[in-house]
């Protein structure tokens, strides 16, 4: 592995590209997050529709219950929890209501540019082992790049943890503030938001695209969101009921049958 990694570096076999955006953002309703074009917070550039856990909870020792979580819980509400859908932006401004100033980041990274060409050379030489090793290392480099960029965002670009000083072990254990949930993972299992994310970031300009099945190309790529809330942690949405499916279909303005196909693993 180390020998192959050195060849990748010295031979410049792979190219790494990334794009990141930081946007004013607020929770809309209970479960959704709106990313806005500017600080006026009136023009959404992306709406991230959220799913909430629906598990039946057992009481804790003190009689309390753990909440059923949604990623939107970690973003400040629009208009200080007034109903953004019921009020126009002009009416809200007239009453002096302002949304809390929160933000959400979006990112996409790839280290897979060049993999296909080199893999084809290995396969032409019947060297399946190195073809597999190359792809595996490219995948690991993509994860490392995502970690490196997240650190840059926390300490500089967004800067909410400018004084962060963590050891490599602490970084691996994710002891930093904030999370970077990726579409398709347990906390946000809906892959379809990748379409809006890729369009917003213009990922095609850095060589990243989506397949019809919403897989990223090159394969050695990572994309997702940044949430900076100090209490934000990862969780598994798990199974949801038809009531939540129907509610999301209405919010998204899409056919329930189409959404059912997208969320089949969680139904």
Regions inferred by a protein language model and the residue ranges of each:
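Short hydrophobic alpha-helical segments enriched in small aliphatic residues
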Residues: 89-91
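Long alpha-helical repeat solenoid scaffolds
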Residues: 133, 263-266
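Generic structural signal for hydrophobic core residues of well-folded globular domains
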Residues: 110-111, 145, 252
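Active-site loops and adjacent core secondary-structure elements that bind or stabilize anionic groups
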Residues: 1-87, 96-131, 136, 155-157, ...
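Compositionally biased, low-complexity/repeat regions
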Residues: 17-30, 36, 44, 49, ...
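Alpha-helix initiation and N-capping motif
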Residues: 1-2, 100, 115-116, 146, ...
């Amino acid at each position: 592995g180390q020998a192959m990694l050195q060849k990748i570096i010295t031979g410049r076999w792979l190219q790494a590209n990334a794009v990141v955006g930081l946007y004013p953002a607020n929770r809309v309703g209970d479960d959704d997050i709106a990313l806005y074009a500017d600080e006026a917070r009136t023009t959404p550039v992306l709406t991230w529709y959220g799913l909430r856990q629906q598990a039946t909870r057992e009481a804790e020792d003190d009689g309390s219950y753990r909440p059923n979580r949604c990623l939107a819980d970690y973003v400040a509400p629009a208009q200080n929890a007034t109903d953004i859908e019921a009020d126009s932006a002009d009416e809200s401004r007239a009453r002096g209501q302002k949304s809390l100033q929160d933000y959400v980041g979006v990112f996409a990274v790839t280290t897979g540019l060049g993999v296909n060409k080199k893999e084809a050379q290995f396969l032409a030489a019947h060297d399946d082992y190195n073809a597999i090793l190359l792809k595996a290392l490219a995948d690991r480099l993509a994860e490392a790049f995502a970690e490196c960029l997240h650190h840059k965002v926390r300490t500089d670009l967004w800067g909410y943890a400018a004084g962060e000083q963590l050891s490599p072990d602490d970084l691996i254990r994710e002891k930093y503030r904030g999370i970077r949930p990726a579409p398709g993972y347990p906390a946000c299992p809906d892959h379809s938001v990748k379409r809006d994310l890729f369009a917003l970031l213009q990922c095609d300009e850095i060589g990243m695209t989506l397949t019809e099945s919403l897989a990223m190309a090159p394969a050695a790529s990572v994309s997702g969101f940044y949430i900076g809330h100090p209490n934000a942690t990862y969780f598994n949405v798990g199974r949801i009921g038809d009531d939540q499916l129907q509610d999301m279909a209405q919010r998204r303005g899409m056919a329930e049958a189409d959404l059912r196909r997208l969320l089949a693993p969680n139904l």
